[in-house]
């Protein structure tokens, strides 16, 4: 029925086997274990001094200055943006917790 001899769709039709993704495709994806370990470390160790300063800058609305500082400390623009967003998220959670009380 669907088997034709020529063209792009030539040959015997088969259903494609769903394979597991390669290990290289997992890069950057946190496992549950790593996530929990990092949360415990963060709870015990707290924030680094530069992270506290970034949070202060974000509190007063100096987002660009906070990004510049993160970028200088972490080395790249993308890492700086990610850290700034992480710190902004922490501030939002803290504000939500204080409003809830």
UniProtKB/Swiss-Prot annotation:
Q: Which PROSITE patterns match?
A: RIBOSOMAL_L36E (PS01190)
Q: Name one GO molecular function term.
A: structural constituent of ribosome
Q: Which GO terms describe its biological process?
A: translation
Q: Which segments of the protein form a coiled coil according to its record?
A: none
**One cellular component term from this protein's GO annotations in UniProt:** ribonucleoprotein complex
User: Which segments carry the region annotation Disordered?
Assistant: 1-31, 75-101
Keyword annotations: Ribonucleoprotein, Ribosomal protein
Similarity-based family? Belongs to the eukaryotic ribosomal protein eL36 family.
- Protein name as it appears in the record: Large ribosomal subunit protein eL36
UniProt organism field: Ulva compressa (Green alga)
**Mind giving the lineage of the organism this protein is from?**
Eukaryota, Viridiplantae, Chlorophyta, Ulvophyceae, OUU clade
Q: Its gene?
A: RL36
């Amino acid at each position: 029925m669907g088997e034709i001899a020529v063209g792009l769709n030539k040959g015997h039709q088969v259903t494609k086997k769903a394979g597991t993704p390669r290990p290289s495709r997992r890069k950057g994806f946190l496992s549950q274990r790593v996530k929990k370990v990092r949360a415990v470390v963060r709870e015990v160790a707290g924030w680094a001094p530069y992270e506290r300063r970034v949070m202060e800058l974000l509190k007063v609305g100096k987002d660009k200055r906070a990004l510049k500082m993160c970028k200088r400390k972490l080395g790249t623009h993308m890492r700086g943006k990610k850290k700034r967003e992480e710190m902004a998220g922490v501030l939002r959670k803290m504000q939500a917790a204080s409003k809830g009380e």
